[in-house]
């Protein structure tokens, strides 16, 4: 409609017309249990933000209906999205399942707005370590959220002591003049998993760039890794299930010799 077009033009000129602060963190999160996705924003101008919600609701074919419950304002965007906010922050919560009741979504969003530190992600030791190293974009993932069937599949190829569900995966992206720096890693609070991860990482060494002369100058992607095949084979054989499968395959192919022959850049 004309109102949304007018707001869109204003936002193009000045993004703060949404009433949202772009100087503070913008946070996306996913709840694996409730199957919901959240967006957390800092409010800079509550009146402008309410105007934005009004236009957003009208575009979705709904009347603006902002209700106040104690110190929290609640607005239903559509059947699968809700916004709760106060004079400081706004939380958009989206249901990934279409059969989710809006009352349940409202209940979850209100609980998140009211929860204390002890019930939040800040109480997770694994996240605390991650939050100490912030860049422009920061991504944190708990492997415990991976479906159990997928975890079992991955586990069948990894050392027995490596508990995937205890691993946290991280990515940091930093935008600098003339370049983008991406750092990724993983860590665990579980002692046995830590040791297994260190052992697994020892399989990989620094690349020597031995074969770069053979790569054409117009290449758009180069991926290289330095592997110790003998170490890799020994680690894989620590998993009894994998060792049994290797035994069956080895009747046709000498995998120990094949994998063990890898020693250097690929």
Give names to the regions the model predicted.
Residues 1-6:
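N-terminal mature-domain "stem" immediately C-terminal to a signal peptide or N-terminal signal-anchor/transmembrane
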Residues 217-266:
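Long, K/E/R/D-enriched contiguous segments that form extended
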Residues 10, 20, 51-55, 199, ...:
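Charged/polar, solvent-exposed surface patches and flexible loops
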Residues 9-125, 261-266:
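Single conserved position on a long alpha-helix in the C-terminal lobe of the eukaryotic protein kinase
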Residues 15-18, 60, 207, 211, ...:
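Short secondary-structure junctions and interdomain/linker hinges
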Residues 20, 85-87, 94-234:
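Leucine-rich, highly hydrophobic segment in Treponema pallidum outer-membrane-associated proteins
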């Amino acid at each position: 409609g004309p109102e949304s077009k007018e707001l869109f033009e204003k936002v193009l000129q000045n993004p703060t017309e949404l009433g949202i602060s772009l100087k503070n963190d913008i946070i996306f999160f996913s709840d694996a249990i409730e199957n919901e996705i959240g967006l957390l924003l800092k409010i800079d101008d509550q009146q402008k933000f309410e105007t934005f919600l009004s236009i957003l609701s009208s575009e979705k074919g709904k009347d603006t209906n902002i209700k106040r419950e104690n110190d929290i304002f609640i607005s239903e965007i559509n059947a699968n999205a809700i916004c709760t906010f106060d004079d400081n922050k706004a939380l958009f919560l989206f249901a990934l399942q279409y059969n989710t009741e809006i009352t349940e979504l409202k209940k979850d969003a209100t609980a998140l707005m009211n929860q204390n530190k002890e019930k939040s992600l800040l109480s997770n030791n694994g996240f605390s370590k991650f939050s100490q190293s912030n860049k422009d974009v920061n991504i944190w993932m708990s492997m415990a959220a991976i479906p159990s069937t997928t975890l079992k599949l991955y586990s069948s190829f990894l050392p027995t002591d490596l508990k995937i569900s205890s691993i946290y995966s991280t990515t940091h992206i930093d935008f600098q003049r003339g370049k983008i720096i991406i750092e990724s890693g993983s860590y665990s609070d579980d002692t046995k998993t830590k040791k297994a991860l260190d052992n697994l990482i020892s399989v990989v060494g620094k690349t020597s760039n031995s074969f770069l002369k053979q790569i054409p100058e117009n290449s758009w992607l180069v991926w290289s890794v330095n592997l110790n095949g003998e170490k890799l084979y020994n680690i894989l054989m620590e998993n009894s299930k994998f060792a049994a499968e290797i035994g069956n395959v080895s009747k046709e192919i000498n995998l120990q010799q094949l994998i063990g022959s890898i020693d250097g850049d690929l």
